[in-house]
Amino acid sequence: MNKDIATPGRTREILEKYGFSFKKSLGQNFLIDTNILRKIVDFAELSDETGAIEIGPGIGALTEQLARRAKKVVAFEIDQRLLPILEDTLSPYGNIRIIHQDVLKADIHRVISEEFTGMTDIMVVANLPYYVTTPIIMKLLTDRLPIRGMVVMLQKEVADRLAAKPGTKDYGSLSIAIQYYTEAETVMTVPRTVFIPQPNVDSAVIRLIKRKQPPVKVEDEAFFFQVVRASFAQRRKTILNNLVNNLPNGKAMKEQIERVLTETDIDPRRRGETLTMEEFAALSNALQHVL
């Protein structure tokens, strides 16, 4: 067994060898606790038939743990300075492919078909860069990729929002979007002390398993999410005010919007954060016919 990368000593040794300096703009924080990495991989439930996608491998700490368990690992790294380091640290493994590209610009469908030929179980497992967490997760979900799901580490406050329930302060349009596509569960909290450099916030690991079907029936997905976003535009305002002020033609259609709310058993004085996904689905399906 090769010596783990994710220890304070080995990580510092690698960084010093290459004279690597962290780029704050890329949200680089390297994990130096092997036990936490192993737990993350455990939560992903990989087998020797699984293809794993990683985003932001850093110096390869999580990548090597994935390589020991998965059939193949494909990792997207945006920072060119890390490529020679990864080539060195991951040289003992023959089942890893590093792609030097911004994952937000990548054609992941093509990568999956080329790199994971014949594999039916594909998981995303990553310690996501904090500054682009939400765009990355939403791209992975809205691109309708053939993945089982993802196990990702992110800022704890973002994880709380993804898994939040109606009526809580963390519940918002992001919670609904994530839970529309996946079953979301926060599986572990990670203290800031196990990173180099140490971030200002704690992290959490969230597991998102893709749903075969959304939990609600909506006639127009794009309009459903438009209604959801409008409802949370100003959290302290009522659902009626938010819809009137933030939907196209909302002001001209105030009476119709109020009538639809009443007909769908939603008190116009309620706030968006109190509505369940089922209520948002009923509301958007009804609004679609009057706006």
Curated annotation (Swiss-Prot):
Family membership noted in the UniProt record: Belongs to the class I-like SAM-binding methyltransferase superfamily. rRNA adenine N(6)-methyltransferase family. RsmA subfamily.
Organism: Geobacillus sp. (strain WCH70)
GO molecular function: 16S rRNA (adenine(1518)-N(6)/adenine(1519)-N(6))-dimethyltransferase activity; RNA binding
Recorded superkingdom: Bacteria
KW Transferase (keyword) present: yes
Residues that coordinate or bind S-adenosyl-L-methionine: N29, L31, G56, E77, D102, N127
Locations listed in the record: Cytoplasm
Function: Specifically dimethylates two adjacent adenosines (A1518 and A1519) in the loop of a conserved hairpin near the 3'-end of 16S rRNA in the 30S particle. May play a critical role in biogenesis of 30S subunits.
Protein name: Ribosomal RNA small subunit methyltransferase A
EC number: 2.1.1.182
Keyword rRNA processing recorded: yes
InterPro entries: KsgA/Erm, rRNA_Ade_diMease-like_C, rRNA_Ade_Mease_Trfase_CS, rRNA_Ade_methylase_Trfase_N, rRNA_adenine_dimethylase, SAM-dependent_MTases_sf
